[in-house]
Amino acid sequence: MIFRSRRVKAGLSSYVFRWSGGMIPYKIQRGLPEEMHQMLHQAMSIIEDHTCINFIEKTTEKNYVYMSYSEQGCFSHVGMVNRGRQKLNLGRGCWKFGTIVHELIHSIGFSHEHQRNDRDSYITIAYENVEEGKEHNFKLDREMGLEFSTYEIPYNYASVMHYGSMAFSDEDDEPTIIPKKLSEVSPKQVYYSAVDGDGRPVIGLRKLTWGDVRMINLMYKDHC
């Protein structure tokens, strides 16, 4: 989830919101159990191992990511907001490896895959099934007021940044995101790792994919 003060997988186009040198200072909330520390470090490590990004413990840096636990849910600012401490929160139910990676990639500078401006060619948003008040989670990037680039990477159904089909579903428990059948799109225009019985790519996966890695490295190409 994107922190609501800047709701904006596409990467920020402006260099203003990128972390200098691909270095992201961070600080972890005091008092977190060792298991939580390990999960955070493992998630940061997998990103570092495959991209140009480096997470460094905060010393004197003004801008940094504060990794915290509270009951408020899973959210992060997108990119470097240049306001000093910026929060990445992992609440109850958020302590899953893929979810942590998802939020870390928000902090790097990426929105959701299903909010790309070209998403309507690949998925259908069933707004009639979305929980009241949660519609903003499905807005296109351009509706957020900031510019994003896809870096000419094909639509990635398997992206760790793609919501699942039941995201923010109302009490009727019907899908909110419906992938188009592969027969309706060109396989050369998309990435996917699995297909369901109806011939639709599976979404909502929580593993870092080649497409995610490629997007990050293109955004921070000056530091690769």
Locate predicted features.
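Zinc-dependent metalloendopeptidases
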Residues: 1-224
